[in-house]
Amino acid sequence: MITSAHIDDIRTQVRAWHAKGETVAFVPTMGNLHQGHITLVKEAAKKCDHVVVSIFVNPMQFGQNEDLDAYPRTLEADSQALTAAGAELLFTPTPTVIYPKGLAQQTYVEVPGISDVLCGASRPGHFRGVATVVCKLFNIVQPDVAFFGNKDYQQLLVIRTMVEDLSLPIEIIGVDTIREASGLAMSSRNGYLTAEEKAAAPALKKAIDAMAQGIKQGVSIEQVTAEAKASLIAAGFTPDYLEVCHATTLANAETTDQALVILAAAYLGKARLIDNLRFDR
């Protein structure tokens, strides 16, 4: 696997592949990789001739008092895992490479509406940071296809909308959430959990599953939400949000909506965990 922190190196290699008529998949990450990331790379390798991965802890998507400095950097282990999974090109830029003028002078990409609710309301500016860096990485790598995890459901919708609105010639593929045996969605932030907290963490998925089951049985959204919040609090969580939304617009679910998604974020100790469930009523 070739590794470079330089934009020109990445572009030169991808152009060479495209010149031969070969397809290129891209998996953007922030590193500290787990099996969920590796699954994205393996799926990308099935779809395309070559796989490019980026590791960049993006300062623009972290708010004040968030975990930018504490976010784990594990480049050596990540590189070994990516090589084994089939990645051929790894882009590891510094913030200066991505934002040479600094954040204050950077052009931004902002996706209105869906960026402002749920995680966007809890973390102002977060999705502007995500959209900007992903758009920039797309322009650097010029992939044919890009892969993202469905665990970050709102992020995936933001990126799909950005690609559509800006007419970017990239296919976006979402990959099912990879879970631990307990049902806990794999996340780099699971490393913040103590052993006791990790034992309690599967309650988040259980609460979401119970909500979906209740809604399918005709129980009101208000009732299933109240019961789920109570169960999370009893398990030691501090809920951030727990919402039932239209699956594609993220508007609050109406009684006539069939395609729904439950989106949840909750704090457990130092970790902010998110999860979701897409289902039909």
Curated annotation (Swiss-Prot):
Protein's UniProt keywords contain Ligase: yes
Pathway where this protein functions: Cofactor biosynthesis; (R)-pantothenate biosynthesis; (R)-pantothenate from (R)-pantoate and beta-alanine: step 1/1
Keyword Nucleotide-binding: yes
Assigned keywords, A-Z: ATP-binding, Cytoplasm, Ligase, Nucleotide-binding, Pantothenate biosynthesis
Annotated Gene3D superfamilies: HUPs, Pantoate-beta-alanine ligase, C-terminal domain
Record-listed E.C. numbers: 6.3.2.1
Protein task: Catalyzes the condensation of pantoate with beta-alanine in an ATP-dependent reaction via a pantoyl-adenylate intermediate.
Family, per entry: Belongs to the pantothenate synthetase family.
PANTHER family recorded: CYTIDYLATE KINASE/PANTOATE-BETA-ALANINE LIGASE, PANTOATE--BETA-ALANINE LIGASE
Self-association state and partner proteins as the record states: Homodimer.
Protein name, UniProt field: Pantothenate synthetase
Organism this protein belongs to: Shewanella sp. (strain ANA-3)
